[in-house]
Amino acid sequence: MVAPIPAKRGRKPAVATAPATGQVQSLTRGLKLLEWIAESNGSVALTELAQQAGLPNSTTHRLLTTMQQQGFVRQVGELGHWAIGAHAFMVGSSFLQSRNLLAIVHPILRNLMEESGETVNMAVLDQSDHEAIIIDQVQCTHLMRMSAPIGGKLPMHASGAGKAFLAQLSEEQVTKLLHRKGLHAYTHATLVSPVHLKEDLAQTRKRGYSFDDEEHALGLRCLAACIFDEHREPFAAISISGPISRITDDRVTEFGAMVIKAAKEVTLAYGGMR
């Protein structure tokens, strides 16, 4: 993993090289804030960013919350420091091009595929759209196997990775998300009742893994567990997917234990904490 560049303390406020007005000025300021967060040791306080930018705290906060709404930055930890968001992957591939996470994860995904005999995926959380995005995959060798495109999106309420993420939210956050996004029915098994979904999420927290039982596609089952960063925040999930003929009722617990173990390995290797 590439060592993060420590934040430079006491940096003089930035001085614009050319005059800028309106939205262009706001865009320039926002991009500079994004760069400084990326150069930090993981997260930066609002006051430090404001000092670096030579802006009032209120203006800096407004720029950050705008980028947060689009998923480019996120708040982490009890102090609410600012860190890079996963949506950077969608527009600039910075999340993927660094190769740090994938270099750590891919061997673990391959081992999990060999152990389980099923296709294994890794997805990250896109906080702006509240969807899970597949960024890596190791397909099994069976003729009948699950296949999803890299960059493909998974619904939060009807996928293993999505429900693993949802289970880490508070009930208030889940309620707010469901009110905004709704519960689309993909199959007859999709959980379209908020009450039933919340009951399922409670079971996910208790087990340590989520279980998509033909809720996104008929005949397909998926189990997933979250990966956590250094702030104990979930940012990715590992999943095992396969047909119901192979992921049978008597093997669900076995597959669940496998995916929990793999997720813990990645969390530890990535320097995260649970």
Swiss-Prot record:
Residues 101-272 form the IclR-ED domain. It comes from the Bacteria. Changing residue 146 to D: Strongly reduced promoter binding and tetramerization. GO terms for cellular component: cytosol. GO terms for biological process: glyoxylate cycle; negative regulation of DNA-templated transcription; regulation of DNA-templated transcription. Gene3D superfamilies: 3.30.450.40, Winged helix-like DNA-binding domain superfamily/Winged helix DNA-binding domain (1.10.10.10). Glyoxylate binds at residues 160-161, 212, 222, 239-241. SUPFAM superfamilies: GAF domain-like, Winged helix' DNA-binding domain. One of its GO terms (molecular function) is DNA-binding transcription factor activity. Signal peptide: none annotated. Keywords: DNA-binding, Glyoxylate bypass, Repressor, Transcription, Transcription regulation. The keyword Transcription regulation applies. Regulation of the glyoxylate bypass operon (aceBAK), which encodes isocitrate lyase, malate synthase as well as isocitrate dehydrogenase kinase/phosphorylase. Glyoxylate disrupts the interaction with the promoter by favoring the inactive dimeric form. Pyruvate enhances promoter binding by stabilizing the tetrameric form. Homotetramer and homodimer. Homotetramer in its active, DNA-bound form. Homodimer in its inactive form. Glyoxylate and pyruvate occupy the same site. NCBIfam families: PRK11569.1. This is Transcriptional repressor IclR. It comes from Escherichia coli (strain K12).
